[in-house]
């Protein structure tokens, strides 16, 4: 299969490219840096600039599927300008791809798989939400998810299947939230956040890239929660990390107002509680390699 990937050099993209190449697929990837363009037989780069509406049209030649991972990092301080970048880096890129595919009706693209977020779901500790949930949260990130998904849904009018993976906290040693949680615990200053009771729906990086591959092979359509079967509290996550690192957590929980002073509105990421179901993807036969938090953290840090 020939697959076009946006965000191929990001945390998830890097690992996904490795897996897809190992399975014999050919990768086309889009980059905003002309000096990062490679042209190997099975890994070919193409220039684009979504802000300026520029894209090398050859990128979709003989492509069977698109995987859309591009998007500015949400773990940075949310100034008004950066909020706009968070939205546009996801939506303008999808719109540029849509217009390109629409311009070439003889394309052979059958599916687009897009990253998405769990922020769209209501806050919850006890109630478990699944993909049929109509109620949504009223927050900046929830609105990002709505605009993000709307920007890829338009591919349906071209007869292309649209699969959206609403991704929880991605556990990886190479980036994302986990290394930031590990740092203070390693130094002996770790603590749970707020009440510590907020639920974190998470997924190991290996399971996430396997899920993208599963969605590709099964040519999935619709929304799926990319989270493991066992959501946990922030307190349990903190204690599990400490146990694996052979450290203890002795400090009192960090109050929410302190983190708001330090991080601003972005502190939402630490205190948000999303209790989500993975049943929809399980019912299709997907199997998690790391369903339990202890095994996931041990795999990454032992």
Residue spans of the language-model regions?
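Mid/C-terminal beta-alpha module of Rossmann-like enzyme folds, strongest
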Residues: 2, 217-265, 298-301
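N-terminal Rossmann NAD(P)H-binding glycine-rich loop of SDR-like oxidoreductase domains
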Residues: 3-23
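NAD(P)H-binding glycine-rich loop region in Rossmannoid oxidoreductase-like domains
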Residues: 44-92
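Catalytic helix-loop patch of NAD(P)-dependent Rossmann-fold dehydrogenases
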Residues: 88, 125-164
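Conserved Rossmann-fold NAD(P)-dependent oxidoreductase catalytic core, especially the SDR/UDP-sugar
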Residues: 95-138
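NAD(P)-dependent short-chain dehydrogenase/reductase
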Residues: 153-156, 161-164, 168-199, 241
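Alpha-helical substrate-binding/gating segment
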Residues: 182-190, 198-231
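C-terminal amphipathic/interface module of NAD(P)-dependent oxidoreductases
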Residues: 268-302
